[in-house]
């Protein structure tokens, strides 16, 4: 199975009042050609699809035209899209039922049942090969705000936010391990900063105070993340 991981498209962004739609279109055209040339089976988009929570009709059309063209050129392509901190989770997820019928899974929200338990099932997606058999399980975790994460014991000594994120990934990993068969991979997605990564003051606005949203890289064996605004080592 061949996967391509990308993020932070920021469709609809302007730079000093200059509309960047042409640049974004050139990127999407390149990405489409790359998907075909490399015969990609799964495209992972790790958040910040749009630059703001109220994207223009033009930028929304740009996304949906790309998705349609990708499916035409690669009919078996699977796509997994998670919301980032710039996205409106509800707006991104709204066409989800229609997109899912065409191989595109969109996860914007963390949902809970009446008892307050997080719906883990919708965050764990099977990825299938050309023969229809499951080859990998994807932990599709969108951008997490403090209210999204499970509560941890007050006497654990951990930061409630970071500990809650780690717990959520452990719960999802345990669920994936229970489902996986020999030879099946487990792939974790997220949209977050990592401790030690360089933050761009020019393009990334802070929305959580004090750096508490920056995750220690040690909680992951491997991370397919979005939110980095420049090349960095973590």
Model-assigned labels for residue ranges:
Residues 1-45, 50-233:
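Extended recognition/assembly regions associated with phosphoester-bond processing machinery
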